[in-house]
Amino acid sequence: MSRILKPVAAQDVKYLHQICAQYFMGERAFRIAEYNLGNTFTGSIDLLASDDTTVYLITINIADFADALLRAFTGYRWFRENRDFLQRIYPPEVIDIGLQVQLIILSQDFPPEIPSIVDEVCSVPVGLYRYRLFGSAQDPDIFIEEIQRPGKTLPFQDEEPDTLRTRLGIEAANLSDDDIREFLSAMRA
């Protein structure tokens, strides 16, 4: 018997920010320095994060993608204009504001042409991540995957279902090989 996970809508924006931050800390080893930096008029950043080489300005879309794209760009402009000020506020051991910058946009849906557009138009790297919320609206679970650019290989593309079960720690779910393949293809669609 397969367990059906039903998509749910985000009810609590702060909670969505927290679970996205947990993903980036756990899966990408980012350090989160700040939540909700800036404001809607001059530019805002949902999550200010970094690793050893890059500062990430993360925008989490809960509505229209065009609005999220504009928020990401105005947040980047605000960050650039206030970089000296931010370096005085945040000590380097918390976040090194002088590192290279990458924008990250999380969204449930993307226009199909957006990866090639941001690659061609933007002077700063832009990472695109799709997220899905499952479970209940009061306590959702999240699935996040990076949108692959042409020429990149998809994660788990060539792995056998048994290898994936072990790697993802889902042996106890008793999912069949077909269930795993179906889920992966649905998430990539």
What are these regions (language model features)?
Residues 1-189:
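Charged, terminal alpha-helix-loop-beta segments
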